[in-house]
């Protein structure tokens, strides 16, 4: 556990280090907001094999970290400040610090880079568009239309009534949306099941909304697409065919940053780290090694 200073006091966050490598330190930022590191345990085998030093970490408010009740804490800026405190605690710097964020973790990683890229060696954005309104539009105009009309209608009716506690809501979303676009494995991995069970629903709903189907919480208007050109460090943008995020938008983002590379996962979804694992991990490892060897420009 490491201490984090916030405007409303000091709290502790859970972090676990693997390996020792003064040249490569990777911090993993989970999604949600307020999921847990557990669904990112799949990096362990691959990163340890490469000899990377890396960190699993539960952001403040998540299951293994302190969970203060003050809702003023759940803002992007406050989370960015937290990541900077974590960086200092693990003694990472511009010569070795890589941030890999998935989903909400991708929002946090991009925002962190916009403020603190002078302290980073590389940025990896896994399955997160740089515009929440465009993500919402993709959910409405592309993904929703792939559902059977009667199922979509029932989901929309429940949403209109704000009846999110109704078990039917997840009953509909799980097979028709989550299994199509979140993780396509027939059997969901243990780590993902644990993370889903441990999500802090209060923070998730406040920031994201009631589900992964679009976005309606505090993050709904978030958009930094027109600022991506400010990111000058080597950056990997990862998209996947079946993702909740438009893979074409992910590719475009790789061109908007100064030193971008695009990784496409043809069999993957939002958690391509699980359902297109070989392509995903090979691409991520290749990128980190290339940045380390100064091959990304």
UniProtKB/Swiss-Prot annotation:
Gene Ontology BP annotations: proteolysis
The active site of this protein is located at 103, 243, 270
Q: Where does the record place a coiled coil?
A: none
**Region forming the signal peptide:** none
Q: Which Enzyme Commission number(s) are listed?
A: 3.4.11.5
Record-annotated AB hydrolase-1 domain positions: 26-131
EC top class named in words = hydrolase
Q: Which UniProt keywords apply?
A: Aminopeptidase, Hydrolase, Protease
Keyword Hydrolase (UniProt): yes
On whether Protease is a keyword of this UniProt record, the answer is yes
Among Pfam families, the record links this protein to: Abhydrolase_1
Reaction equations catalysed: Release of N-terminal proline from a peptide
Q: Which domain of life is it from?
A: Bacteria
Cited PANTHER family:
AB HYDROLASE SUPERFAMILY PROTEIN YCLE (PTHR43798:SF31), MONOACYLGLYCEROL LIPASE (PTHR43798)
Matching NCBIfam families:
pro_imino_pep_2
Quote the function comment for this protein. Answer: Releases the N-terminal proline from various substrates.
Q: What is this protein called?
A: Proline iminopeptidase
Q: Which organism is it from?
A: Flavobacterium johnsoniae (strain ATCC 17061 / DSM 2064 / JCM 8514 / BCRC 14874 / CCUG 350202 / NBRC 14942 / NCIMB 11054 / UW101) (Cytophaga johnsonae)
> What is the primary gene name for this protein?
fpaP
